[in-house]
Amino acid sequence: VIQNKSTISDETKKRVRKAMKELNYHPNLNARSLVSSYTQVIGLVLPDDSDVFYQNPFFPSVLRGIAQVASENHYAIQIATGKDEKERLNAISQMVYGKRVDGLIFLYAQENDPLVKLVTEEQFPFLILGKSLSPFISLVDNDNIQAGFDATEYFIKKGCSRIAFIGGTKKLYVTQDRLTGYEQALKEHKLSLDSHRTFFADEFLEEKGYKFSKQLFEYDPKTDAVITTDSLLAEGVCNYLNEHQLNVPVLSFDSVNPKLNLAAYVNINSLALGRTSFETIFQIIN
């Protein structure tokens, strides 16, 4: 039926396919690998399939690190993505139930993720590139609270006191942690925390950085430093500052466009994160 052979009647095919759908059945495309029980394939779960993901310098660098170690271990990579959560869940289901991959690496971390819930319940090998609140989930991550603290303190030690923070969506743990570090640094140095100086983008886009910069400097023209958690946001901030001839220092995180005139950047070792991610999931599988 699955192969649509002509020797099977249409009525029989219809009944079997209906049963497959009700049973949530997915064909195992790697049955030929039953002898070894390994597919030699790792699945990568992307946060979305938009151009924004591929434009962000962080992810290609991570992917390069993963691909390097995968190749060294004779593994292939399969990408699971979709335009929304439902499509991504379907892609993951096919990988897990069809045993198309040996394990999964999530290239993002967010609260109450139904995809993570699925693989956890199925006890399928997986790893999160980022943070998890569960002690039972394997992960690879930087100390983003400390990174946010250090970035903020860098400006404070240079005499800045009206420091803005422009980050991604608060659903992402990385945004939450860097914001926490930012707030801790302000508190430790007895500087006031003004919510009008913190902004959160639902997408990492240059235009978001530009838009937030406009709002920021209309609110406080004396803002003396800007921290962005992403290089695309930083690009938008720098474009706004250049257009309005504002000499305000900007700091961003890893994989920064060398054309941007940044005061500093935080190296989050994206290539090493990718390499370590594959090494870790490989150990889990074996």
Name each model feature, range by range:
Residues F165-Q184, E235:
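Secondary-structure junction motif
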Residues V140-F165, T180, E206-K214, A234, ...:
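Hydrophobic alpha-helical segments within soluble ligand-binding/sensing domains
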Residues S37, V41-L44, D48-E153, L216-E218, ...:
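Alpha-helical recognition/docking segments in bacterial nutrient-uptake
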Residues V1-Q40:
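N-terminal helix-turn-helix DNA-binding module of bacterial transcription factors
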Residues A70-T81, E183-Y210:
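Short beta-strand elements in bilobed, periplasmic/extracellular small-molecule ligand-binding domains
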Residues G43-V45, A164, I227, L251:
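Short, well-ordered beta-strand segments
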Residues K214-N286:
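Flexible loop/turn connectors
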